[in-house]
Amino acid sequence: MATNGENGRHQEVGHKSLLQSDALYQYILETSVYPREPEPMKELREITAKHPWNIMTTSADEGQFLSMLLKLINAKNTMEIGVFTGYSLLATAMALPDDGKILAMDINRDNYEIGLPVIEKAGLAHKIEFKEGPALPVLDQMIEDGKYHGSYDFIFVDADKDNYLNYHKRLIDLVKVGGLIGYDNTLWNGSVVAPPDAPLRKYVRYYRDFVLELNKALAADSRIEICQLPVGDGITLCRRIS
C-alpha cells in the first residue's frame, strides 16, 4: 500500500512514472536501470535534470526499453519527432549499428544542442540528421517524394500531442510493413481516466482530449497491431501489418 507521501507525490502532474509506489519505481531504477545505463546517457540525464523543463525528457527506464526494442527488431533506419535534449535520441543512436541512421526533428535546436556535445563525445553524431522546424511539412514532402514509403524500421513520436493523429496519418506510409511506430505519453499523466472535475494542470487538461482521440483511433486502425504499455508516461507501440 502506498504511504500518504507516495500518494501525494503521485498527485503531482510532473511525476514521470505511473506506478502507485515511488519506492517501487526507485527500486526498478536503482536495481535494473541505473546500473546498466551507459555513461553518455547518465551524463545527458544529469545535464537535462538542470533544465527548467526537464519533465519533457524521456525517463531512464523508457530509454532502456527503447534500446532493447531497437536491438530486438534489428532497426537500422529510424525517425524521431520531438527531441528535446536528446536522451531518447542518444539511446537510439547507441542501439543502432554503426551505419544506422536517425532523422530527428524538433522545433527547438537550442535544446538539442544541450545534448549534442554528449552525442559527439560518444562518437554517434554521424548517425543523426537533425532538422529544426515543424515535422509535418517534412513528412508531407517525404510522402510526395515517394522513395521514402515503407523505408523506416522504427519511428518514435514524443512531440505536440495535438498533432499525433496528423503524424499517424503520414507515418503509417513511411514505416515499413513489420516496422514499429512508438507514440509516447499515451496515458498522459494518468489523466485519460481522470473525472471531468479532476484538478489537472492547464496543459494536461488541454492535451488530454487529443491523447484520448489518438488512443481511440489507434485501437480502431486495422493497418496496425498495437500494444499500450505503462512505461514512463505510457507508450503505445504500433506494428504496421498492411
UniProtKB/Swiss-Prot annotation:
A divalent metal cation binds at D158, D184, N185. Belongs to the class I-like SAM-binding methyltransferase superfamily. Cation-dependent O-methyltransferase family. CCoAMT subfamily. It comes from Nicotiana tabacum (Common tobacco). The lineage of its organism: Eukaryota, Viridiplantae, Streptophyta, Embryophyta, Tracheophyta. S-adenosyl-L-methionine binds at T58, E80, G82, V83, S88, D106, A135, D160. SUPFAM superfamilies: S-adenosyl-L-methionine-dependent methyltransferases. The gene is CCOAOMT3. GO terms for molecular function: caffeoyl-CoA O-methyltransferase activity; metal ion binding; S-adenosylmethionine-dependent methyltransferase activity. GO terms for biological process: lignin biosynthetic process; methylation. PANTHER family: CAFFEOYL-COA O-METHYLTRANSFERASE 3, O-METHYLTRANSFERASE-RELATED. This is Caffeoyl-CoA O-methyltransferase 3. Its cofactor is Mg(2+).
